[in-house]
Design a protein with these regions (language model features):
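A short aromatic-anchored loop/beta-hairpin motif
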Residues: 2-100
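Conserved beta-strand elements of the Class I
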Residues: 9, 41-43, 128-130, 159-161
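A general structural signal for well-ordered secondary-structure junctions
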Residues: 39, 101-102, 156-159
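Short, well-ordered beta-to-alpha junction loops that form the rim of enzyme active sites
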Residues: 46-48, 108, 162-164
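Internal, conserved structured core segments that host functional sites
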Residues: 89-144, 149
Length: 164
């Protein structure tokens, strides 16, 4: 348990090439990671996981997804071997009841919208990382309510996502 509550961070990842680069963005991400209290887990809401429904990754070892094309081979070799946490996934699902979220044990993982930033914020990749999908068919109000239901987790889970 951390000593002070964590708030959500809204971080646009920009180019996946930021994973390999040192620039003003990646330096700020590293500084953020050094300044944050250590969370129990990280939950990222990723626009790259855009489905008809809401799901949270619930595997112990989420795969790293290279969901892009046209970049150098070195980027496709990038890895962020963070663990997952089915237990934290269940806590998230419980917070979103009734009926908001399903557990995803094997169809997704950690996409570049998450790992390209976390490679700098938490470079050791030793914190459980979970992703929450974006419900492509739900109205704006649904997503606001989702955020309200996630709010009580702020003292246990760092959350990240971006909305433009």
């Amino acid at each position: 348990m951390i000593s002070s509550p964590l708030r959500s961070a809204f971080i646009g990842h920009g180019s996946p090439m930021n994973t390999l680069e040192s620039n003003r963005f990646t330096r700020q991400w590293r500084a953020l990671g050094q300044a944050l209290p250590r969370p129990r887990a990280v939950l990222c809401i990723s626009a790259h996981w855009f489905i008809h429904g809401t799901a949270v990754t619930a595997m112990r070892h989420p795969p790293v997804i290279h969901d892009f094309f046209g970049f150098p081979g070195e980027l496709f070799e990038s890895d962020y071997p963070a663990p997952g946490s089915p237990e934290v996934a269940q806590e998230i699902a419980d917070a979103l009841k009734p009926g908001y979220v399903g557990l995803d044990p094997d169809s997704w993982g950690i996409d570049h919208g998450t790992w390209s930033v976390l490679a700098h914020v938490f470079p050791a990749a030793d914190l459980p990382v979970l992703q929450l999908s974006v419900h492509g068919a739900a109205p704006f109000e649904y997503h606001l309510e989702l955020g309200r239901r996630l709010a009580p987790l702020h003292d246990r889970v760092a959350r990240s996502g971006a909305s433009i």
